[in-house]
């Protein structure tokens, strides 16, 4: 959601803060601001809209001199996207400034208390209570004020705090919202995401819940909630900063679509040992598992839906999928014979973390599949498998989805061999089919030039329907999400067999229907649905294998993918749908990498 950065050192802080905020744009935001300490005074600049406007307002930071500062990109939760609601927020006496990512759940009670005590509020946000509490508790010791303030807060928060009276010092506080410290020489940093730090340092410390840090140019000291110092391991950030640049592509999304063969290979190759699969240090006693539950949000959830069929078929275990935002409030039948598989690109998705903790409380064993090393989900899981996708900057996930599928497919084969639920000869054929995945994804990507023509045909549609059965339906879910989130065209997915149970009433002349027809065992059933919608005037764009002549005779337009084993088809089927969504959005002039109202990492509920 929001992004925060901080710097203290020997350079002017504002340009560094602006650059860090630019690296956090992909998280989604509607306003931005920075605050800098100079000559025992705090200067603040805020704008609604893009960071480019903030850079222009401050002359790229030159109008805000000072070597200690904090910055923020806001995604509105409490209060409209206005300058008064933008961060940083300052105290009534102007001596303190705060940036915040998260939600203060008890802000209404705190606001009433502070108002009674004479504090004046300039904004509608939950964050402003924090800076007034700090002012109230400050008696010449910022550390003590921060501790007393944190003890009053309920909710999730990552805070950055500066004080005009202690101008070379920043306090950073974490509670259920990611916060990373960057270590330099004569300068130090913090940010809500490592992407804001790698241009300046590769040495990072990941704060845990309940910890806070005192940051000066020469020293970083970390404390627990009682104020005792904590020794932390320094992590080395290994990925190349060039991976977070566009590299000649017009958009990060297109770059990341094109990176999928490499990302899938990077995720797969270290885990394939000849004719065997080795899943890092995974040591689950699968013989004691009676059911598997997959939980996630958004595209990660749809990856779980697609992989469910492979895991269930190969492992002969019942597999359920449940949205994390629903699972956390349900009463699931979970015990110590349940394996919970948790998917999250960022490893910081708030609903997923909450659902995971609830299932752990009930005894479930937990396996995390995440992309960000050292993230919260990775740390609290019993086991973790990383998707080596590299940084994903575009808000709409692409390589994150396909690498999650890859790990799930690897797990399905690994578990099937351990459980002896698949014959050896069949297992070897499946392994060979999985090894071909990067090549087949590349072949699907080769259709990119032809997408422009289809985008010109379909970009003016008011709505689109995506249909399929079984795995094809799971892919339809993700395809519809891609279309709606970046092109702003209403797109819905339906199990093809459900069309006649209501949805077919919406089919009219010229209505685009994207039909997924890659599961040959049930293709004829989907063909009957194509005939039904065609009879009512729909324009059908079908995704199928090239040798499927029957589909060609029915569809108005075709998207071909290479032949692939049906258990693994989702990772290839999704490629043309990603490309179609990208080119439709481009035709419509949409902000492809940063769609309106969306955030890359949803760290609040």
Where are these regions (language model features)?
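Conserved short alpha-helical segments that host acidic/polar catalytic motifs at enzyme active sites
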Residues: 1-246, 250-251, 262-290, 302, ...
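Structural beta-sheet core signal
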Residues: 4, 36, 98, 161, ...
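Glycine-rich oxoanion-binding loops at beta->alpha junctions
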Residues: 67, 71-84, 267-284, 307-343, ...
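Acidic/histidine-rich
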Residues: 156-187, 454, 459-485, 520-522, ...
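Active-site phosphate/pyrophosphate-binding segments
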Residues: 260-264, 268-293, 383-512, 522, ...
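Glycine-rich phosphate-binding loops that contact phosphosugars or nucleotide phosphates
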Residues: 287-429, 433-436, 516-559, 580, ...
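Generic C-terminus detector
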Residues: 539, 552-554, 560, 564-605
């Amino acid at each position: 959601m929001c992004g925060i950065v901080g710097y203290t050192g020997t350079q002017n802080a504002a340009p560094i803060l602006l650059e860090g905020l630019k690296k956090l744009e992909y998280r989604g935001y509607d306003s931005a601001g920075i605050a800098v300490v100079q000559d025992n005074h705090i200067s603040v600049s805020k704008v609604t809209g893009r960071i480019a406007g903030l850079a222009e307002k401050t002359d790229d930071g030159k109008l805000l001199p000072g070597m200690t500062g904090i910055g923020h990109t806001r995604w509105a939760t409490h209060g409209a996207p206005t300058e008064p609601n933008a961060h940083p927020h300052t105290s009534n006496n102007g001596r303190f400034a705060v940036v915040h990512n998260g939600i203060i759940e008890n802000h209404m009670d705190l606001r009433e208390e502070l108002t009674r005590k004479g504090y004046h509020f300039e904004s509608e946000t939950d964050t402003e209570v924090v800076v007034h509490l700090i002012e109230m508790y400050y008696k010449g010791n910022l550390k003590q004020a921060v501790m007393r303030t944190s003890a009053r807060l309920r909710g999730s928060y990552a805070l950055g705090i500066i004080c005009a009276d202690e101008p070379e010092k920043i306090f950073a506080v974490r509670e259920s919202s990611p916060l990373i410290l960057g270590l330099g020489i004569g300068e130090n940093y913090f940010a809500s995401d490592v992407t804001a730090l790698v241009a300046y340092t590769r040495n990072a410390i990941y704060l845990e819940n309940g910890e806070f840090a005192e940051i000066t140019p020469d020293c970083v000291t970390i404390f627990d909630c009682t104020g005792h110092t904590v020794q932390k391991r320094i992590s080395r950030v290994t990925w190349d900063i060039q991976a977070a640049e566009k590299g000649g592509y017009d958009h990060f999304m297109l770059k990341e679509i094109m990176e999928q063969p490499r990302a899938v290979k990077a995720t797969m190759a270290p885990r394939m040992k000849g004719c065997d699969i080795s899943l890092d240090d995974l040591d689950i006693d699968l013989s004691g598992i009676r059911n598997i539950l997959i939980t996630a949000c958004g595209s990660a959830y749809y990856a779980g839906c697609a992989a469910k069929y492979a895991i269930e078929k190969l492992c002969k275990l019942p597999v359920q999928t449940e949205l994390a935002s629903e699972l956390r409030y349900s009463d699931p039948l979970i015990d110590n014979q349940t394996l919970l598989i948790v998917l999250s690109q960022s490893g910081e998705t708030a609903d997923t973390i909450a659902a995971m903790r609830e299932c752990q409380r009930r005894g479930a064993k937990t396996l995390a599949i995440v992309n960000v090393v050292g993230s919260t989900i990775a740390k609290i899981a019993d086991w973790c498998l990383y998707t080596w996708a590299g940084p994903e900057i575009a808000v709409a996930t692409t390589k994150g989805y396909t690498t999650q599928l890859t790990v799930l497919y690897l797990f399905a084969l690994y578990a099937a061999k351990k459980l002896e639920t698949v014959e050896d000869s069949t297992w070897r054929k499946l392994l060979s089919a999985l090894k071909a995945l990067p090549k087949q994804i590349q072949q699907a990507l080769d259709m990119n030039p032809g997408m422009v023509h289809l985008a010109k045909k379909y970009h003016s549609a008011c709505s689109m329907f995506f249909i399929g059965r079984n795995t094809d339906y799971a892919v339809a879910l993700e395809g519809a999400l891609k279309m709606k989130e970046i092109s702003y065209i209403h797109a819905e997915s339906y199990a093809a067999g459900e069309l006649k149970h209501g949805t077919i009433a919406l089919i009219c002349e010229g209505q685009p229907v994207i039909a997924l027809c890659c599961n040959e065992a049930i293709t004829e059933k989907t063909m009957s649905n194509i005939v039904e919608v065609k009879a009512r005037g729909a324009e059908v764009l079908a995704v199928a294998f090239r040798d499927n002549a029957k589909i060609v005779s029915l569809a108005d337009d075709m998207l071909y993918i290479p032949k692939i084993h049906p258990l693994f088809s989702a990772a290839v089927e999704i490629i043309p749908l990603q490309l179609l969504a990208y080119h439709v959005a481009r035709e419509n002039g949409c902000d492809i990498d940063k769609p309106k109202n969306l955030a890359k990492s949803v760290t609040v509920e």
